Amino acid sequence: MDAIFLRQVWSGNAAMEKKLEADKTPIGRERLHYFRINAGPWSRLDEDKPFVPGSPEVKPVTGSFYPPGMTSDEFENWIQTLSDSERENAKSYFSVIRLDADKKLKSVPYNEEYKQFLDPAAKCLREAAALTTNESLKSFLEKRAAAFLSNDYYDSDVTWMDIDAPIDVTIGPYETYEDGLFNYKASFEAFVTLKDEAESAKLARFSQYLQEIEDNLPEDPKYRTPKLGSGAAIRVVDEVFASGDGNRGVQTAAYNLPNDERVVKEKGTKRVMLKNVQEAKFNKTLIPISKVVLSPADQKDLSFDAFFTHILSHELMHGLGPQNIVVDGRNTTVRLELKETYSPIEEAKADITALFALQYLMDHNMVDKRLERTLYTTYLASAFRSVRFGLSEAHGKAVALQFNYLSDKGAFNYDAATGHY
């Protein structure tokens, strides 16, 4: 997954990695280390500024999903010349856009573009499937191996939802953050985790409230989903391994997958909470930052439980709200219509709707009201943690949007004399 993702970020990454590996100087070792952290020569925590001499000044918004320098207008003009099925392939999660021998644009499925990596990956998954005695995990590994070869991920995505095993595996093309042009194309990643059965059972109760929250979202009722997908699985796990898009730059604390709207409609989504990662983020990042930005009186209200619960609610809220929509008589999705603005808007939606949902549950005595003060205080402190990701990253941009709006509305105050909020 690392090898594929590296090539998805930028077509020059593989060659640059080899060049850095050949540099045995101390600064060369440091550059290679940071290159691998960022999956490229741009610092994701520093507005994508380049740190390797000779690398492009600007990280390409196209990644390597599209021809270098391609604009959104060029893509839109091209797909207007295609048939419906060809247009669907061009916008697919699982294809790249390339120039053929005659310099004409074409879509190439992932199983062809990344064949040299996916064929051996499929072999490894089949070998792993043969070793496990857990039938649900075995089924997923076998079907995901087949998907790597066929480029049809639907069946294995559905099966992934039903994994019930001590070891939970997520592997394949999922998130679309790296496609800065349209957020159409999925990046490859992998997570191997150990399930925390007790914590998973404790949080499963939140699933029973999702339809009620959906029915009470502050939006025009016509945009509400009258019947959410049947699956609303919540898994609390400890991460033991991550790669590809799951192990670059800022480490994710949780994920809500799959993103394929067909699967979401039928089965819902699975929310995976990486508890050991969240504990590290809270203790090693949020607490130290809070001592700088929050008043001493408010620091007592910070709580890991509030931090963990808001992240859980955030992931649950990704599955709520409009997904499949009709625009000018066309059946489409929110993701396809919002294009490059989708990811930050979706992350902001999940953050704020998470607060709305938890407030709703507290107001209706479904969640302990004592969470209220710690929830909002911890949310504010966490905003300073997340905005460090930068405006070029979806979560960082989403937090900046929220922070500025809430500041304008007087949701919190800044004391210029103390420098605290």
Regions found by a protein language model. Give the residues of each.
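N-terminal helix-rich structural modules
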Residues: M1-A130, S136-F140
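Structured segments of extracytoplasmic/periplasmic soluble domains
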Residues: M1-I4, C124, A128-L131, R144-A147, ...
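Zinc-dependent metallohydrolase catalytic domains
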Residues: A3-I4, Q8-T25, R29, E279-I289, ...
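Short, compositionally biased low-complexity segments
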Residues: R87-L105, E112-D119, T170, Y174-A190, ...
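Contiguous, non-catalytic segments that form substrate-binding/exosite surfaces or channel walls
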Residues: Y110-S303
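General structural feature for long, well-ordered alpha-helical segments within catalytic domains
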Residues: A121-C124, L137-F140, F308, L312, ...
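Short active-site segment of divalent metal-dependent hydrolases/proteases
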Residues: S313, M317-G321
